[in-house]
A protein has these predicted regions:
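Cross-kingdom leucine-rich repeat
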Residues: 1-269
Length: 269
């Protein structure tokens, strides 16, 4: 057990979805250098269910830098009262990378009355979560003060990365540190932001758009970038030239037309 103090990555894998896992908190307390945790093939997030009060009170998992949730089949959102131990991790100032992969029941990344803000998260990777229609609402996106990289792949219902709901009060969106946005194989995606409020992205360097056949614009409002923005990567070949035409919305429109032309020519052939 003494060797656990050297462990920096733990992967919890459950091959029986009917099994209700329960990992003793005493084991976690013997892992002071644990920085990465992966939970795979798990039907629910009751991994530490019997010891939730201790985990929340002692903040046992707040030193994690990387959290990966892979095929947690009943996960519907993050930030609800059903998984307070997960909320403690996601709101920790140490957490830098969040991966959410193959979660078929995930309907919203952030719960409607969230207990977490992801304020300290720098990188977010979402892959193959087919019930997701958006990642953030207007009311939650400005809390992502340290977010540098978003990658969303193969989420067939995704319509917007940031959604403006009917009762949202208009406000300027500022993602001060966001450097890169990667949007891959999103068949329903129409835009990054669905509203018309001003969008400020002073650190943005590159946007990747690949197989997003419905994406005709980035945002309907004004978009302010700095000279650091290089353009849009519109293919899966990193050495290809970036697309830039006047501004970000015009560049997205150009990529849209290019991909429509490519799709039509491939259909004919």
């Amino acid at each position: 057990m003494d060797n656990l103090k050297y462990l920096n990555h733990i992967q919890l894998y459950f091959d029986d979805e009917k099994e209700i896992p329960d990992l003793p908190i005493q084991i976690l307390q013997k892992m002071p250098n644990l920085t990465k945790m992966t939970i795979s093939e798990c039907s629910c997030l009751e991994v530490f269910q019997t010891q939730i009060p201790e985990i929340v009170e002692k903040r046992v998992l707040t030193h994690l830098k990387i959290l990966k949730l892979d095929n947690v089949s009943k996960l519907q959102s993050i930030g609800s009262e059903d998984s307070p131990w997960l909320n403690v991790i996601c709101d920790s100032e140490k957490l830098q990378q969040l991966y959410v992969i193959n979660c078929p029941d995930l309907k919203t990344l952030v719960h409607s009355t969230p207990s977490v803000t992801f304020t300290y998260v720098k990188e977010m990777y979402i892959d193959n979560c087919n019930e997701l229609t958006y990642l953030f609402t207007l009311s939650s996106v400005n809390k992502l003060e340290n977010l540098e990289h978003i990658e969303v792949t193969d989420c067939e219902s995704m319509e917007a990365i940031v959604l403006k709901e009917e009762d949202d009060i208009s406000e300027e969106i500022k993602l001060q540190k966001l450097k890169r946005v990667e949007l891959n194989d999103l068949s329903s995606l129409e835009c990054f932001y669905s509203g018309n409020d001003t969008l400020r992205l002073p650190s943005l360097m590159q946007v990747d758009i690949w197989i997003c056949p419905k994406m005709e614009f980035f945002s309907r409002g004004d978009i302010y970038l700095n000279s650091s923005f290089k353009g849009i990567q519109a293919s899966n070949v990193s050495s290809d030239d970036l697309v830039f035409h006047h501004d970000l919305n015009s560049s997205v429109q150009k990529v849209f037309l290019q991909q429509v032309t490519t799709f039509n020519s491939e259909s004919i052939n």
